[in-house]
A protein has these predicted regions:
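Alpha-helical transmembrane segments and membrane-interface helix-loop junctions
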Residues: 1-195
Length: 195
């Protein structure tokens, strides 16, 4: 049982490290949102493009026109948001910081709660993460081979990159479920010192 606890803690440390690093995606996401809102509100992209055209800096105009569009900014916002969510989901689960509906669960003792957690992991989380991981890989691979781009004319290319976060996030959530499962098994079947 001690090995299960060691494995659980190792997985939790890995997920904590990934979650803490991924949480930094919040800063570029906020920056992109702020820039997008300000440029759309005040029409700064149009002003910038007009300035470069008026001063005959066509190279700079082409860069702004090609790389910085409102559509690309909006798509980058949701790409960063999806990556942040998927990379931190496992971290949230091992830290028990996700939302729970405590209507029924709060009335039970610790052992019953632990059994509910084990049953929930085995019946719901493991099959769910497996299916989304498996189909997410196919989804990503198909996108990569088709060289899928945004449906918007001026949107982001390489759509497979964001789609790859789905199987990655599900793998991390599976690891989190495994860590919580091991921890609960040690609690239920191990000695008092181990739990």
């Amino acid at each position: 049982m001690q090995q299960l606890l060691i494995a659980s803690r190792a997985i939790e440390q890995l997920l904590s490290s990934i979650g803490r690093i991924a949480a930094w995606l919040l800063l570029p996401m906020m920056l992109v949102i702020i820039v997008d809102v300000i440029t759309r509100k005040f029409g700064l992209l149009t002003i910038t493009k007009d300035f470069f055209l008026a001063t005959e800096m066509h190279g700079a105009h082409n860069i702004v026109n090609k790389y910085i569009t409102s559509t690309k900014m909006q798509e980058l916002e949701w790409h960063l948001h999806a990556a942040l969510f998927l990379l931190c989901m496992g971290f949230g689960y091992v830290k028990n910081s996700h939302v729970r509906i405590e209507i029924v669960r709060e009335k039970f003792d610790v052992y019953t709660k632990s059994w509910l957690e084990v049953i929930g992991i085995v019946i719901f989380i493991i099959p769910y993460t497996y299916l989304l991981f498996r189909y997410g890989l196919n989804f990503t691979e198909r996108s990569f081979h088709l060289n899928e781009v945004s449906a918007a004319l001026t949107g982001l290319s390489h759509r497979w990159i964001i789609k790859a976060f789905l199987p990655l996030g599900m793998a991390l959530l599976f690891l989190a479920a495994l860590a919580v499962l091991l921890r609960n098994l040690v609690f239920l079947f191990g000695s008092k010192e181990e739990s």
